[in-house]
């Protein structure tokens, strides 16, 4: 016990002092960033990064279409009138209904899509004139991992000029946001997402130990600080949503992603997950998206590629082990996002499960945020689970049965 306490104290000292010191160095651009990151809350979930000129990084905020930016509100649809959805004082439900009534089918579809960023799907780091001819001319729900310093899987890190310093990175994301606000019909901002289970996935951000390593500390205050730093660094870089924490409960050490969980105890996962989310979402700096819902970490034979769990777990195990952390983090920390999992349970893929993603998650657990699918999970309904006859059917199942963000 004494040895364990000494180990915990040493690890806590390393993280809470050295990492905090590094984080403070990371945040020395604060004064510049205050000028760059001018934000307003849009429909209660999208954090709006107001745009700037593309010629250089300005010292003072100066929008291109200045006529859009009124005193106390923004004319997102450029019609010269304050629509209900543009009125920050209007009830949120009224704003949503007004916006939906103005959206075309194409615009609604695009808001359900996540686009991988630079060098993964996007070929451009900053908007070009060609963007008005692309799919995202009607807007896009989210752009994931844009300019975080990584390219396509397996390739070396990007040497893009906007990766660092933080002020330049945030300016570049502002430019991307400017396109969606100023150049699309309704001006709906996009959500800049990134990974963050051991710090923000960015070339220069603080790199923490794995979740499994952090879980061994059993230190709530420490994890809260990790969440606080992760959220703060993400916000300084211009990201608005971080895919963390992982709330899976590790029960089979053969599983290839075991290092990503806090541990084998659902109580431990819940306690540390609560603190991580509270830290990340402190002062509305970013949204936290917990994953993977649900029963993902105990695949049959620990075979990740199979994406199947039945009949590995009984209903009681699912409820007491795997649902428990999500219930508590949603209710006690106000988790804003949930990522659905690849696996099936009892023969039904979670990705298209109305029972799990609507009846249980939104009904019984009281979740009021958004649900995003894991990468390729929609496609897996066709290619892996075989519950859809083609890709169109896979999309239909995902939308009609669970209403998720693809």
What positions do the PLM features span?
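N-terminal regions encompassing targeting/leader/pre-sequences
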Residues: 1, 405-406
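Bacterial Sec-dependent N-terminal signal peptides
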Residues: 1-5, 9-53
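Glycoside hydrolase catalytic-domain context in secreted enzymes
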Residues: 52-405
């Amino acid at each position: 016990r004494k040895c364990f306490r000494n180990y915990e104290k040493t690890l806590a000292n390393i993280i809470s002092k050295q990492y905090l010191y590094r984080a403070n160095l990371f945040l020395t651009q604060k004064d510049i960033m205050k000028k760059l990151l001018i934000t307003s809350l849009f429909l209660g979930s999208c954090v709006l990064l107001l745009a700037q000129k593309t010629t250089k990084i300005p010292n003072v905020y100066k929008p291109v279409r200045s006529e859009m930016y009124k005193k106390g509100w923004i004319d997102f649809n450029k019609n010269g009138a304050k629509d209900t959805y543009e009125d920050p004082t209007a009830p949120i439900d009224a704003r949503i209904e007004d916006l939906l009534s103005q959206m075309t089918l194409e615009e609604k579809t695009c808001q359900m899509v996540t686009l991988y960023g630079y060098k993964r799907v996007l070929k451009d780091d900053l908007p070009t004139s060609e963007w008005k001819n692309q799919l995202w001319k009607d807007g896009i729900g989210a752009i994931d991992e844009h300019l975080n310093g990584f390219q396509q899987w397996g390739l070396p890190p990007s040497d893009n000029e906007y990766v660092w310093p933080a002020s330049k990175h945030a300016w570049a994301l502002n430019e991307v946001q400017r396109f969606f606000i100023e150049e699309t019909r309704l001006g709906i901002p996009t959500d800049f997402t990134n990974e963050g289970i051991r710090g923000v996935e960015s070339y220069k951000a603080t790199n923490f130990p794995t979740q499994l390593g952090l879980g061994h500390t059993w230190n709530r205050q420490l994890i809260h600080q990790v969440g606080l730093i992760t959220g703060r660094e993400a916000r300084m870089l211009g990201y608005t949503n971080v895919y963390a924490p992982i709330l899976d409960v590790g029960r089979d050490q053969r599983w290839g992603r075991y290092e990503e969980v806090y541990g084998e105890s659902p109580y431990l996962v819940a306690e540390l997950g609560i603190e991580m989310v509270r830290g990340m979402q402190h002062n509305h700096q970013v949204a936290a998206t917990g994953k993977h819902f649900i029963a993902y970490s105990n695949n049959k034979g620990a075979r990740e590629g199979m994406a199947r769990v039945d009949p590995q777990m009984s209903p009681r195990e699912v409820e007491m082990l795997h649902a428990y952390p999500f219930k508590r983090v949603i209710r006690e920390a106000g988790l804003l996002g949930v990522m659905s999992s690849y696996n099936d349970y009892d023969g039904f893929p979670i990705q298209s499960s109305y029972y799990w993603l609507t009846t249980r998650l939104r009904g019984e657990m009281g979740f009021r945020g958004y649900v995003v699918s894991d990468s390729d999970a929609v496609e897996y309904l066709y290619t892996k689970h075989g519950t859809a006859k083609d890709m169109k059917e896979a999309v239909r199942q995902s939308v009609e049965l669970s209403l998720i963000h693809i």
